[in-house]
Amino acid sequence: PDVSSAASDVYKRQDIKLLFGCDTGVGNIYKDIGNKYGPIDLTFINIGAYNFYPIMPYKDKSVYHTNPEEALEVAKNLKSKKVIGMHWGTFVLSLEPIMEPPVRFKAGAEKYGFKKDDAIIYKIGEFGSLKKLLDYN
């Protein structure tokens, strides 16, 4: 597939590293990024819009969107300390139940080495503070 329109970016400010994974699938590149730039303090990654079967039977999952467990795997490969699941529940792009991604994301956190509080889901419309999340002044 043409991945030129998909993007993930690492942002660094002082000693803080953030990764914003936008419209991304799973790949070995994240181990490479983790080895080169890790540990990442906070990763933002998509967890929704991944189930396209049976409307596209030749494509049983999205190559552009991780499911919740794949998102946790990516964050683990990045050596992320914390991970925020995003890109879910806004509007229907695929066939998984619209509220399934955050439930699966939180349920799978410990399996991928994250404390439940370090796999973060915001309610629709909720916002948070990077200072609070990263414990810096």
How should these model regions be labeled?
Residues K12-L18:
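Beta-strand-turn-beta hairpins that frame and shape the catalytic cleft
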Residues K17, G25-Y122:
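Cap/insert and terminal regions of metallo-dependent hydrolase folds
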Residues G21:
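Generic enzyme active-site microenvironment
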Residues K132-N137:
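Short, surface-exposed amphipathic charged segments that create phosphate/polyanion-binding patches used
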